[in-house]
């Protein structure tokens, strides 16, 4: 808590450290482990506990301490039925509180922007009073025209998981079609642009080579799949999307193996290990899975990432050599792989990169770089979905 109060958050999130420090200094943000003081003073308490057991304990404890029935708003991902189960536990214990499901849709690396400019606010509650108070709290967003969806708790809980599954389906679709592009001489990047301009489709999450990662992505889809199975519903599209997402690293490995004839006893540098730019999270990262696959096939791997090396080390267990710059990751390598679409990689000195590599081969799994420029410089450039 002391570290957090100083703005030293244990993860990387663009602009968040500065916001925390500014608001702590202004007295608007206080960190404390004294749950009793909050329970006795606050009318509305937002619960960001990520463990179902802990969430239940916190709800019961606050409800016992609060002088009047509090409004307890759950903002972290929870399985469908959580709010209903909490209400039953409260009733059985003779306690009172209003439980609201308000799923937040924060994207790693864009959380501050997502909070300030959300696509919508979801309020899952049958209490008109709770809805009115929450609309007052989020008045600046409401006045800005952010849509507010008021629904029951189960629907609010299901929105989060369904949104994750839909995005996974969209990502998996463009990755499947990008494989077809490679066979027929089409360009998946241009195809994705054309598809995204269709108002029925929209451009976000249509980047060939992108995977479905993040801390909650797998758990959201697991929870939705389990809910469907428990209720006798077959979610075939979700199952197929997950299969495609899980196979992405194998497809990328095949690209590298084809460019090098084989990856065994080859030296491969990877630029980027985070699952996406502007985050240190490697949860569900296709780049980390690719590094593991390369090592398993006998390759020697070096890697560089601006912020995710610490998290990656916990996943890769010493099987990869970590570098302090992109140039160190390229030196003496048979191929250089772009694993994460960090914008700074576009600004690298590719003349220098070319002289550092044993072979001027770049496998760009995110289609981040200027392929025409690199080929003109003498690189063998391999992208995703670019026939």
Which residues does each PLM region occupy?
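Structural/interface elements that position substrates and couple domains in central-metabolism enzymes
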Residues: 1-387
